[in-house]
Regions:
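Long, contiguous bundles of hydrophobic transmembrane helices that form the permeation core
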Residues: 71-175, 278-321
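Membrane-interfacial loop-to-helix junctions in multi-pass transporters
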Residues: 26-32, 113-119, 173-179, 205-222, ...
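Hydrophobic transmembrane alpha-helices that form the pore/transport pathway of multi-pass ion
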Residues: 1-44, 54, 234-266, 278-293, ...
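Core transmembrane alpha-helical segments of multi-pass membrane transporters/permeases
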Residues: 136, 163-200, 214, 218-227, ...
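Membrane-interface helix termini and inter-helical loops of multi-pass transporters
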Residues: 62, 193-209, 316-321
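Membrane-embedded alpha-helical segments of transport systems
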Residues: 1, 33-55, 71-87, 265-273, ...
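Alpha-helical transmembrane segments of multipass membrane proteins
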Residues: 42, 53, 57-61, 122-130, ...
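Helix-coil boundary and interhelical linker segments in multi-pass alpha-helical membrane proteins
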Residues: 59-75, 247-258
C-alpha cells in the first residue's frame, strides 16, 4: 500500500489498524508492534514499482525515465526489507513466539480468487510505463480502470455507487491539492535559494565543514536532510534537499544519480527519526505505547535504512548503474 500511496503516515493509518493489533495479539510488545508498522510503511516510498510521487519528481530532475529510477531503487529497497524481516524474526525467536495457527491463515488461492483482480489497476499502470507512455497518462489509465475492475467481482461490485465514486474523487482532489501546495511552497523556497545564492553558500559551507572529506560530507548532508524533512511530506522535502544538498555531493565526486537517491532516502527516513517522527506518532496512536519507546524501537529496526545510502554512494553498482 505504501508504494502506491507515497505517504508513510497514510500507510500506517490504513494497514496499521489491522497489523498492529495482530502483532500485539501474537505477543509483540506495543512499542515494537508500532515501530514495525512505522518502519515498514516508511519503506513503501523506496520500494518499486510505484514509490509515490517523489520518484516521478526525481525522474524529471534527472531527465530520465521513471523506470530507471525504479531500477536504481530496487536492490537497496530489498536490503531494507530483508533487514526488517530478519529483525522481526529474531525478536520472535528471542521471545519464543509463534505465528498464527494454520486454521486461521487464509488460503492464498482463495484470497487471489476473491480479491486478486484488484491488482489490475497497478498492473495497468506498470504496463503503461513499460510501454513508454508518460507517468500522467499511466496514472490516468490506472484511475480509469478502477471502476471496471471493481465490477468484475460481486464482492467488490457492491461498493460501486455514485456516493462512493464522488467520495473517491473528493479524496483524490484533496490529496492532489496537498501535494500541489507543498510542491508550490517548496518551489518558492528554491526560487529564493537560487536568487539569493544561498544554495552556493550552503554547498561551500558543507565542503568547508567537511574539509573535502566525502564521508564527513555525507554525514553532514544526512543530518541536514533529516532536519529539512522533519514534519514535511517527502516531495517538498526532497525538492529542497535537491537544491541545497545535492550540488555539494556532486562537487565531491558523487555521481548525480547516487546523490539524488541519497537525499531521497533521508527525506523519507525523517518520518521515523525523533523528535518529529510522524510515522511513529501515527502508529503510536494505534499501539498506545510510549512514544519514546516506539521511536527508539523504530530507529533500531530502521537502522539499515540509514546505512544503505552510504553503501550506494561508495558503491554505485548497488543502484544497478
Amino acid at each position: 500500500f505504501g508504494t502506491v500511496s507515497g505517504s508513510a503516515v497514510a500507510n500506517v493509518m490504513t494497514t496499521g489498524a489491522f497489523t498492529i493489533p495482530l502483532m500485539k495479539r501474537l505477543g509483540y510488545k506495543r512499542a515494537f508492534a508500532g515501530s514495525v508498522e512505522a518502519v515498514a510503511s516508511t519503506g513503501g516510498q523506496i520500494m518499486p514499482p510505484i514509490m509515490g510521487a517523489t520518484a516521478f519528481i526525481m525522474a524529471e530532475f534527472l531527465g530520465i525515465s521513471y523506470l530507471k529510477v525504479a531500477m536504481y531503487a530496487l536492490l537497496p529497497a530489498l536490503l531494507y526489507y530483508i533487514a526488517l524481516f530478519l529483525s522481526i524474526h529474531f525478536e520472535a525467536k528471542k521471545n519464543n513466539m509463534h505465528g498464527l495457527d494454520r486454521a486461521e491463515l487464509p488460503k492464498v488461492s482463495t484470497v487471489l480468487k476473491e480479491r486478486g483482480h484488484l491488482f489490475l489497476p497497478l498492473i495497468i499502470i506498470i504496463g503503461t510505463l513499460l510501454l513508454g507512455f508518460s507517468a500522467p497518462f499511466a496514472a490516468l489509465c490506472g484511475i480509469a480502470s478502477t471502476i471496471p475492475t471493481a465490477l468484475l467481482r460481486k464482492s467488490t461490485r457492491k461498493h460501486i455507487n455514485l456516493t462512493n465514486i464522488l467520495k473517491a474523487l473528493e479524496e483524490g482532489a484533496k490529496n492532489t491539492v496537498t501535494v500541489a501546495l507543498s510542491c508550490a511552497c517548496a518551489g518558492i523556497v528554491i526560487g529564493v535559494i537560487f536568487i539569493t545564492g544561498l544554495g552556493l553558500e550552503f554547498t561551500n559551507l558543507v565542503l568547508s565543514a567537511a574539509d573535502n572529506h566525502l564521508f564527513l560530507a555525507l554525514v553532514l548532508t544526512s543530518f541536514a536532510g533529516i532536519l529539512l524533512g522533519m514534519g514535511m511530506p517527502t516531495a517538498p522535502a526532497y525538492i529542497m534537499q535537491t537544491a541545497l544538498l545535492v550540488p555539494a555531493l556532486v562537487k565531491l565526486g558523487v555521481i548525480v544519480e547516487a546523490a539524488h537517491m541519497f537525499v531521497f532516502y533521508f527525506a523519507i527516513l525523517s518520518a521515523i527519526t525523533p523528535p518529529v517522527a510522524l510515522a511513529v506518532y501515527a502508529a503510536n496512536g494505534i499501539s498506545r505505547a510510549s512514544i519514546w519507546d516506539s521511536s527508539l524501537a523504530a530507529l533500531r529496526l530502521g537502522a539499515t535504512g540509514y546505512i544503505i545510502p552510504f553503501m550506494f554512494v561508495f558503491g554505485p553498482s548497488l543502484l544497478l548503474i
